[in-house]
Amino acid sequence: MSTNGDNHQVKDSLEQLRCHFTWELFIEDDEMPDLENRVLDQIEFLDTKYNVGIHNLLAYVKHLKGQNEEALKSLKEAEDLMQKEHANQASVRSLVTWSNFAWVYYHMGRLAEAQAYLDKVENICKKPSNPFRYRMECPEIDCEEGWALLKCGGKNYERAKACFEKALEGDHENPEFSTGYAISAYRLDGFKLATKGYRQFSLLPLRQAVSLNPDNGYLKVLLALKLQDNGQEAEGEKYLEEALANMSSQTYVFRYAAKFYRRKGSVDKALELLKKALQETPTSVLLHHQIGLCYKAQMIQIKEATKGQPRGQNREKIDKMIRLAIFHFESAVENKPTFEVAHLDLARMYIEAGNHRKAEETFQKLLCMKPVVEETMQDIHLQYARFQEFQKKSEINAIIHYLKAIKIEQTSFIRDKSINSLKKLVLKKLQRNALDLESLSLLGFVYKLKGNMNEALEYYERALRLAADFENSVRQGP
């Protein structure tokens, strides 16, 4: 029977390890089902040479769910894969798996087995150049940490990129390190699309990763999307066709190829690919969201073709597109309640359906969220302000939320839209009442934000004079 002293001694040793239990992977409880689904999908459908890490992550997720026996099975699979995939460097590559074994056994109260794995780690770390007893600084472990962070969501992407950068310092031409760095760069670029002045940087890393991994269809389709972002759609389509011709990782390739086609305007082709992928991964949050966006795009196409006046069959088609989009957006947020962008798309689609009650409920959920990206919160306030202005006819609430969007000082196109929307609303109010003190002050504020200081001073002075006149009239009485 173990003593408390043994327990503390083992725990102190465990804290020194480099593994999923010590990497501070930020995973919310309501994100766990989606994370587990994505991990299982990757194991089954992503053809990659880098599968050991994903089994380690699955073990960690199983542990968090209280399924330690299942966690041990996943670690055993990781250990077996290590022998097949990295036999020449299995000892160093096994450090993360052995460290996770030690932690799981510790949590199960099996201290002797935990200590046995600690001993295995210590034996590998015994090098004259290594000052640590239970840890080793090496690019392979930096890479494993990067993969784990990358899989655990947007709040971890910067740290993931830093891990892959550190790994590449030790081996510039390593295909796996290059792949991880390129994917983390691509994800970070996606976060910053709305940021004014942001210089996207993933194109060169993606080109480098594709050159080092010429058979990787997943990387090629990401490169195709990035080229499309940069206005190089023709070159992007060449990589896309290569990815689609390759049988590897087809479920993943279909997801991103569909995005390429949707943005190109080939919505039917996009839907065809997404439905094929959905047959393989029916709970995929990304797929449901992308399908919803396709139906939204089809709705917009019909509206534009009918100049916003759809009748008869066109009206029926639009109603069908709205229902289908709502179904898929609802599926996305059901499987991942923290998916802010899908919630926002769902709220807008409820508005299209005329279901203001559901739209309000969805916006209230959104207003309680804490998105990783500030621009997302700006967009939540902007869209809610528009809902209040145009559907609920509440100018007061609209102004409040335009101001809340503007108050988030991250420079972005969304913030600019919020400023312009506030200006339009205030000018409309002043047309009805040129002596509206609040509107005069707000217009001065808008011009100040735009850098038009002369106009700002003019409206501030008019507001001050109006306030002074009002105060004098109150003093003088009737």
Curated annotation (Swiss-Prot):
MF annotations from Gene Ontology: RNA binding; RNA sequestering activity
Residue sites binding mRNA per the record: W147
Residues that, per the record, bind RNA: G190, K259, H289, Q290, K336
Keyword match Ubl conjugation: yes
Protein's cellular compartments: Cytoplasm
Database matches in SUPFAM superfamilies: TPR-like (SSF48452)
UniProtKB keywords: Antiviral defense, Cytoplasm, Immunity, Innate immunity, Phosphoprotein, Repeat, RNA-binding, TPR repeat, Ubl conjugation
Entries under InterPro entries matching the protein: TPR-like_helical_dom_sf (IPR011990), TPR_2 (IPR013105), TPR_rpt (IPR019734)
Coiled-coil zones: none
Physiological role: Plays a key role in the innate immune response as part of an interferon-dependent multiprotein complex, recognizing and sequestering viral RNAs that lack host-specific 2'-O-methylation at their 5' cap. By distinguishing these RNAs from host mRNAs, inhibits their translation by competing with the translation initiation factor eIF4E. Could also prevent viral replication through its interaction with DNA replication origin-binding protein E1 of several viruses. Causes the translocation of E1 from the nucleus to the cytoplasm and can also inhibit its helicase activity in vitro.
Protein name as annotated: Antiviral innate immune response effector IFIT1
Natural source organism: Macaca fascicularis
Name of the coding gene: IFIT1
